[in-house]
Amino acid sequence: MTTCSLERKINLPVEKVWSLISNFTKSPAPEIKIEVEKEGDPAAGGVGTIRMLTIGRTRVREILDTVNPPHSFSYRIIGGTPTKEYKGKVTLEGKEDTTIFHWHADIKPIVPLTGGIVCMVAKGVINTFVDALEKHHT
């Protein structure tokens, strides 16, 4: 298992960042395409939601596992990556009018000894996601 993490400062209040990223059915920026495959509980965007997320040429299927408003959610990637297992968590920490965005993932790659490469690619996708948030909302 490979553990990956990333921390970014976003120049938006935590409530705004949460409103942009917590609904699994809505895209926070035009560069991020979301197709809902299955609605969650209690409604679309809730636990159990399955979506296809596209950022550039990267396409992954994700399922939302937990939501803890207004600061964290966890998810799994269930398709589109060279992994046997991928469990991710996003946590937001408010600091005055900014947000510290924490991302953590435990990744088990299909090919042994490639965890570092998979982690590097995942970090690139997460950075692109955060960059898009900042570009369109700050």
Model-predicted regions and their roles:
Residues M1-A43:
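Hydrophobic ligand-binding cavity/cleft-lining segments
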Residues L6-R8, V60-T66, Y86-G94:
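Hydrophobic/aromatic beta-strand elements that line small-molecule binding cavities or substrate pockets
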